[in-house]
Each structure stands twice: as C-alpha cells, then as structure tokens.
Amino acid sequence: MLTILSEKKTLSPWAKGGIGLSAGALLLVLVGLLFPTAAAFFPLVSLWCSCVLFYGALWVLHTAGVELDFFHRAAIIAFWAGAVLYFYWALDRRQFIYAWDYVNYIQKQFNTEAAFALGPVAGFKYIISTFSEDYTNFITLFTEFPFCLTAKTGDSYAFAQVFCVLPSLMLMLAGLTIKIGQMLEVKNKFWYFLIGFSWVLTYPFLRMSAMLAQPDWFGLIFAFAILLLTLDYRFEKLEPGRFMLIFLATAAIILSRRWYLYFVVGYYFSYAL
C-alpha cells in the first residue's frame, strides 16, 4: 500500500496553473451567461487575462531554457517593490494635464467599460472591432484590473500598469538578461544579473510612456518573448510548443499596437539572414 502511494504521480506546477486558469475561464463563462451586465465581469476578465499573461511569460522562460533561482526571484520582487514606490512618488509629486495623445488609452478604457456594461458579447465585439486601428483596445483587457479599483484618473491609469503590465515585463527582462549571459558564458553570474537587470529595468525610455499613461511597454513583453524564444534557436529540430509561443507572441505584439509590425518584420528578416 505504501509503495502504491509513493508511486502516485502528482501534478506539476504547470499543470496546476493550467487547471486553475481553465477553471477561471469556466467561471467567467458562467458569470457571463448568468449575469451578463454585472459590473464585476470585465474586471474579472482583466484579472484572468493578466494571470494568463504571467503564466505565459513563465512558460516562455521554461521553453527558452531559463531557470529563475531564489536569487533571481528575490531580485525581481525587490525591484518590483522599488518600482511601486517610485511610480507612487513620481506621480504624486507632479502635475500633468492628460490631453491629446496622453488621454487616448484612458478614453479607450472608458469606452470598453461602457461596451462591457451592455454584456460580454458587446464588449468583446467592440474590442475586436478595433484590431485594424493603429491604437487597438487589446491592452484594455489587461489594464481594467486594478484600474477599476482606483479613482480612474490619468495618474491612476499610469500607476495601475505597475500591477498588470510590469510583473510580466520584468520576467521577460530578467529572462533576457539571463539568456544573453548564457550565450556569452558569463562567469560572475551574480553581479552580471544584478547590474544587467537593473540597467535594462531603469532604462528611461522603458518607463517614459508609462508615466504618461501610454502603455506602449505592454508590447515589449511580447517582443522580448520573441527574442527569448529565437536568440539561440536555429530550428534544427521541431518544437511545437516553442512554435506556438512564437506565433502567439507575434500575434499579440501586432494586436498591442500596429507600429510594432516594424519590429516584427525587421527582426524576422534579420533572423532569416
């Protein structure tokens, strides 16, 4: 009996995560059917999408052969906490009028909220209808939570990105730092990661648009995912899982904002050469 119990297989963390996300999706379907105009439906969808994004980022790291040990995880959490404090301090001490291009995504968020107030079908139909525009509403699926819990100002929209965009972006930045270190065969991995990760994370152009309520850095999650999955991969063997992630990241980066097509075409052309 003890032998049978010891040989019983347990679910991997990946399987548990997939089951949890699937259960969440089923719950959303039930809520959408039973309470189609519930105010909490869109925020719940947004929370689920952010969880899927974070799970996908972890899966990209796993597929790319990047492992985060305790030091890496502790550094990411510490830097994220520092980013929360920095954004709160920087946004609190300034006065900025959100107009013209700076109010564009905030207005899109309000429009998407109004569409979902009519029901799930109307909400998703509205988002899909913008996919051919320069500024799509794809990002609104991820920024509604925790934006829905704030005063819904320009500053609160910028601050909300620290919770729904930055965690997945930091995973990609950390993974890319480690991957490049692997390719360069870095000896002192501790200081290399600490210095390299802090430099890429504090790069001014990474956060400038986010501070102005423009979530352009959302697309960088998928750009860095593409880099992680292809930098040291030469298509010498078939890896369906990797191919699927590359396809999804490419589709997502195009949906996030159309001008990311310049990166997609330029990078894949250079990669092919």
Explain the meaning of each model-derived region.
Residues F205-F218:
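Short acidic/glycine- and proline-prone juxtamembrane loop motifs at membrane-interface regions
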Residues L34-A39, L85-N104, M211-A213:
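Helix-to-loop transition at the C-terminal end of transmembrane segments
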Residues F159-V186, A225:
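Transmembrane-helix motifs of polytopic, lipid-linked glycan transferases
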Residues N104-T112, P120-K152, F159-F163:
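Short hydrophobic/aromatic helix or loop-helix immediately within or flanking a transmembrane segment
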Residues F235, F263-L273:
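Perimembrane helix-loop-helix junctions
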Residues M1-Y88:
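Start-transfer (signal-anchor) and selected internal transmembrane alpha helices
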Residues R242-R258, F269:
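Membrane-interface alpha helices of multi-pass inner-membrane proteins
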Residues L11-W14, L184-K187, A223-F243, I253:
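Membrane-interface transmembrane helices that cradle and orient dolichyl/undecaprenyl
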